[in-house]
Amino acid sequence: MEKPDSVKKLCEASLRVDTSLLKMLADADIRGRICEDKNGLLEAVELFEIFCREQDCWSKPREFATDCARFHYFHAEDSYIDYIPHEQFKCEVTMLSGLPGMGKDYYIQSAGMDMPVVSLDAIRRKYKLSPTDKSANGRVVQMAKEEARTYLRKGQDFVWNATNITRQMRAQLIDLFVDYGAKVKIVYLEQPYHTWRQQNKSREYALPESVLDKMLDKLEVPQLTEAHEVVYHVV
């Protein structure tokens, strides 16, 4: 509560967890401790509940007037929490997010997405570059960004088809898309573990198990604060 941007951090937390359960956990943790400042810590927990109630996120997610208002609040400096920005997007970018073998290509086909697709895998195959060749990753991403810019300049909706498994990776792309006036929708895809592994083995360009393990360790599931819209397609 005493940290910078405490309101913003609290509201973000409320979109991820039930704040009343968070307080319950903290209270139980403190009562189980043997320490001199137990009363002070218990008082801080009670103040946390008051703070949540003041910000209208006690036992519920903080609500925003629109998805765009939520995105603006978490991405703009010193933004007013109840500000409702004017929505005038030039195009919409659908960013897929998911580990290799989770069915991103199948999702594009089954969803009937009649728009261009910027695919990092397609670029790698075109230039015969291995997905495990880290030295080529930068080149592939730059080519994909240039392709994306052609659609952004024209105001053309498109799909960005890549793993996008870390928040930092997504943020860099979202900043680019938003600079061109695009609305960004993240679609996160996840299959059961054994289904995922089997689907990878069945792919024409299957990845080694060791590579999948490393990517799984790095996975950061997209949060509602990251884009104008976040969809969880979890089977």
Show where each model-derived region lies.
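Acidic, metal-coordinating catalytic cores used for nucleic-acid/nucleotide bond scission
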Residues: 161-170
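Glycine-rich phosphate-binding P-loop
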Residues: 92-112
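Conserved GTP-binding G-domain of TRAFAC-class P-loop NTPases and closely related GTPase folds
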Residues: 94, 114, 193-235
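Conserved phosphate-donor/acceptor-positioning beta-strand/loop module used by diverse small-molecule
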Residues: 180-199
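Divalent metal-dependent phosphate-bond-processing catalytic cores, especially two-metal-ion Mg2+/Mn2+ enzymes
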Residues: 1-90
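Short catalytic-loop micro-motif centered on adjacent basic/acidic residues
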Residues: 158-162, 186
